[in-house]
């Protein structure tokens, strides 16, 4: 929530017995207090990291985006000498914030260990057995890009069997974000946006030891995969 804080003393005298208090409205995190002590004249004190303990029950209960408030107070001898307030957006647990703010957070919705994927992977293995006589997913062990393509195709074929219906995402979703259906919802509801389906496919690929990629363009998202045992150095790359 807060990485670090710097308290500046711009006066000509040292400030003694200085403390910090951070409160949250609604209480999506516990009140944070910190004793700084003395700040010399024309100096500053940095608090890093700021160890905020979040209220997971409240955050998981959110069903829509809401705006919260953060209040930071600087105290001297327990009395307020400075107050700073700002707002923060709180998202429901299935909301992605879009490309404008930490786009790499989309990776949190790729869930290769989700139990709903097991039947899909099992169905995909039957396609592998039919095509090459071996149902095993070997990831990159063979160092053969064509084998990786076969594994990708098998998972894709298994997902096609699910008869999932495509539905349009919200306008400008890639910028402002959207609600994302996790695998169990897509497979149960039999529908999903391009991002829902891309995230589902990526989860299946990662579940069998492959390295998926998510590509975003105006109004659309697609999933790809490395054909070699490689990854980008950075989690988010602009083209």
Describe the role of every protein-language-model region:
Residues 1-4, 65-69:
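Short, solvent-exposed loop/turn segments enriched in Ser/Thr/Gly
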Residues 1-4, 48-50, 136-137:
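Contiguous beta-strand segments within globular domains
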Residues 5-12:
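Asparagine-centered strand-capping/turn motif at beta-strand->loop junctions
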Residues 12-21:
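Short, hydrophobic/aromatic beta-strand segments
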Residues 22-65, 77-80:
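Intrinsically disordered, low-complexity Pro/Gly/Ser/Thr-rich segments with frequent PxxP/GP/PP motifs
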Residues 79-112:
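Short beta-strand elements
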Residues 113-189:
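Secondary-structure boundary elements
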Residues 192-239:
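Hydrophobic/aromatic-rich core segments of domains that either
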């Amino acid at each position: 929530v807060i990485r670090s804080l710097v308290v500046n003393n711009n006066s000509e005298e040292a400030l003694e017995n200085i403390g910090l208090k951070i409160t949250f409205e609604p209480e999506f995190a516990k009140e944070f207090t910190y004793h700084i002590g003395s700040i010399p004249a024309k100096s500053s004190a940095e608090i890093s990291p700021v160890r905020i303990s979040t209220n997971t029950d409240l955050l998981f209960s959110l069903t829509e985006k809401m705006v919260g408030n953060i209040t930071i107070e600087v105290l001297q001898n327990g009395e307020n000498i400075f107050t700073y307030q700002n707002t923060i957006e709180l998202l429901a647990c299935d909301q992605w914030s879009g490309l404008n703010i930490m786009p790499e957070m989309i990776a949190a919705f790729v869930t290769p260990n989700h139990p709903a994927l097991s039947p899909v992977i099992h169905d995909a293995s039957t396609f592998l057995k039919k095509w090459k006589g071996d149902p095993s997913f070997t990831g990159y062990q063979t160092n053969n890009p064509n084998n990786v393509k076969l594994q990708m195709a098998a998972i894709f074929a298994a997902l096609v069997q699910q008869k999932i219906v495509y539905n349009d995402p919200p306008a400008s979703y890639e910028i402002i974000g959207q609600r994302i259906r996790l695998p169990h919802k897509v497979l149960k509801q039999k529908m999903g946006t391009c991002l829902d389906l891309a995230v589902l496919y990526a989860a299946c690929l990662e579940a069998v030891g492959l390295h998926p990629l998510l590509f975003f363009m105006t109004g659309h998202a697609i999933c790809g995969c490395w054909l070699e045992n490689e990854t980008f150095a950075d989690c988010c790359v602009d083209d």
